[in-house]
Amino acid sequence: MNHLIIRQLGIQPYERIWHQMQDFTDQRDEHSADEIWLVQHPAVFTQGSAGKSEHLLTSSHIPVVQTDRGGQITYHGEGQQIMYVLIDIKRLKAQGKDISVRELVTALEQCVVRTLEDYGIDGYPKPDAPGVYIEGKKICSLGLRIRKGCSFHGLAFNVNMDLTPFSHINPCGYAGLEMTQLKDYISEDNAQCKLVASKLVAHFCNILGYNSQKITNKSEIQAV
């Protein structure tokens, strides 16, 4: 049986959660349960390990953090649902699951696509630009780091937020890439991070076959 711990962390500074993910990954062993961390961050730009400084177009009051995830620069802010996936990929392989880093990325993209389908929205991934898009606009960004055969970092789904800071950057390294969010397609009452988080978790668990969940921190996420 595959066990998964889901942590609902509220609004937390980016660097605190990033360092906690690093510590968790460094300290986990073959008996450590996989975890999902659900969180929102106060305004911050994060630069991926392959990030180029020219993709930060203008300076602002928003801090820039150089991080160890894959990819280029992106923006995080309140109203964006983050789902970090701390998954022991090598253990899943040992259990007979056909999974690679690329397939984990695909699973993340598909859980977003299925979440959008729940709202009657047609979203899709692009083979040459990880993430999920609606009519050419990006609604979800992805970035992972693999250490000791285990993943951390994850996805950022724009739900109901101020998209203006994206104008200070080339999002994910793509000049002119337009960003979008869920509230542009449904009523604002329904564009809530807690509702999106519940759907993301359910679809992710179904895709990867997690059949037992432990929910912590008074999460409103419902087990599947």
Curated annotation (Swiss-Prot):
Binding sites annotated in the UniProt record for substrate: 69-76, 141-143, 154-156
PROSITE patterns linked: BPL_LPL_CATALYTIC, LIPB
UniProt-recorded Gene Ontology molecular function terms: lipoyl(octanoyl) transferase activity
Compartment(s): Cytoplasm
Chief subcellular location: cytoplasm
Catalytic reactions on record: octanoyl-[ACP] + L-lysyl-[protein] = N(6)-octanoyl-L-lysyl-[protein] + holo-[ACP] + H(+)
Cellular component, GO annotation: cytoplasm
Ranges of residues in domain BPL/LPL catalytic: 30-212
Superkingdom: Bacteria
Swiss-Prot/TrEMBL keywords: Acyltransferase, Cytoplasm, Transferase
NCBIfam families: lipB (TIGR00214), PRK14342.1 (NF010922)
Other remarks on this protein: In the reaction, the free carboxyl group of octanoic acid is attached via an amide linkage to the epsilon-amino group of a specific lysine residue of lipoyl domains of lipoate-dependent enzymes.
Family of this protein: Belongs to the LipB family.
Protein name according to UniProt: Octanoyltransferase
Lineage, highest ranks first: Bacteria, Pseudomonadati, Pseudomonadota, Gammaproteobacteria, Pasteurellales
The gene coding this protein: lipB
